[in-house]
Amino acid sequence: MHSSVFILILFSLAVINPIFFDMKVEAGCMKEYCAGQCRGKVSQDYCLKHCKCIPRFI
């Protein structure tokens, strides 16, 4: 019983989390995140303008 509930929770997170995250990406990323992602890139301005957040699964 417990394992099926656990699997259901994991599945719902895997399905709902990306949808929720896409909505947050539309609103824009944290500047610190984009600065970290674009550091050392040749086209830093382009990178910052087109920066997208990538969800990290813990």
Swiss-Prot record:
Q: Which cysteines are joined by disulfide bonds?
A: 29-51, 34-47, 38-53
Listed GO cellular component terms?
extracellular region
Signal sequence, start to end: 1-16
Q: Where are the transmembrane segments?
A: none
Could you list this entry's UniProt keywords, alphabetically sorted.
Answer: Disulfide bond, Ion channel impairing toxin, Neurotoxin, Potassium channel impairing toxin, Secreted, Signal, Toxin
Q: What is its main location?
A: secreted
GO function terms (MF aspect)? potassium channel regulator activity; toxin activity
Expression across tissues: Expressed by the venom gland.
**Compartments reported by the entry:** Secreted
Q: Which domain of life is it from?
A: Eukaryota
**Family recorded in the similarity comment:** Belongs to the short scorpion toxin superfamily. Potassium channel inhibitor family. Alpha-KTx 20 subfamily.
- Please explain the role this protein plays, according to its UniProt record: Blocks potassium channels.
Q: What is known of its domains?
A: Has the structural arrangement of two alpha-helices stabilized by disulfide bonds (CSalpha/alpha 3(S-S)).
Under which name does UniProt file this protein? Potassium channel toxin Ts16
Species the sequence originates in:
Tityus serrulatus
